[in-house]
Amino acid sequence: MEHEFWHERWAKDQIGFHEGTVNQYLHDHWPELAGNGTDAVFVPLCGKAHDMWWLHDRGHPIIGVELSEVACKDFFEEAQEKASVHPGEPFTTFRHDDLQIWCGDYFQLVPDDLKHIRLVYDRAALIALPPEMRKSYVNHLTAIIPDDTRILLITLDYDSSEMQGPPFNVTDDEVFRLYGEDYEINQVLKRDMARDNPFAKRRGLRNGATESVFTLVKK
């Protein structure tokens, strides 16, 4: 999937994958992973997710990485918050207190960039990628985060003949194939999305969809 695909989606406001509110599963299940702590959080392929403000409001330093400059700017403008902008290579950094969005290619991150990270929140990264890119995404993620980093992962599964992603369908079995060798995986929720759910109706999912929530801890 080329960079231009995502730049075009953001430029044309074709962002049906964006949630305009805090994700309910984050709200419900984050304490299971993070407890009452305020460890630093990495949000890959973060877009302009409101979830980052929710995490920041609970004391977590945030590093998000996002390819689209439009998304980075919108994130702060829509919250009516100012960010300092620091151009650089391979990332331009948008900063507001200890909330940062790094604008650039996720695959350019190196371990030193995330050495202080202890938590990862992935609601829209794995499911944003087509099947042929997911192994590379996971391999890179597990290579750049510290070994004691814990992950909250949210996935979506549906009949792929009914809808063309993104978001793409990711089965529970695929999560275990991608992460199972190195991580203890706990599926904390699996819930069917009703056929009359606005997202399912908008995208033509006549058979609905299934959402899953996982916590991952290094073995």
Swiss-Prot record:
UniProt entry tagged with the keyword Methyltransferase: yes
Keywords in UniProt for this one? Answer: Cytoplasm, Methyltransferase, S-adenosyl-L-methionine, Transferase
Give the record's GO CC terms: cytoplasm
What subcellular locations does the record give? Cytoplasm
Q: Which GO MF terms are attached to this record?
A: thiopurine S-methyltransferase activity
GO annotation, biological process: methylation; response to metal ion
Cite the EC number: 2.1.1.67
Q: Give a yes or no for keyword S-adenosyl-L-methionine in this entry.
A: yes
**What reaction gets catalysed by this protein?**
S-adenosyl-L-methionine + a thiopurine = S-adenosyl-L-homocysteine + a thiopurine S-methylether
Q: Which EC main class describes this enzyme?
A: transferase
Alphabetized InterPro entries for the sequence: SAM-dependent_MTases_sf, Thiopur_S-MeTfrase_Se/Te_detox, Thiopurine_S-MeTrfase, TPMT
Matching PROSITE patterns, A to Z?
SAM_MT_TPMT (PS51585)
Positions binding S-adenosyl-L-methionine in this chain are 10, 45, 66, 123
One Pfam family of this chain: TPMT
- Record family assignment: Belongs to the class I-like SAM-binding methyltransferase superfamily. TPMT family.
Q: What is this protein called?
A: Thiopurine S-methyltransferase
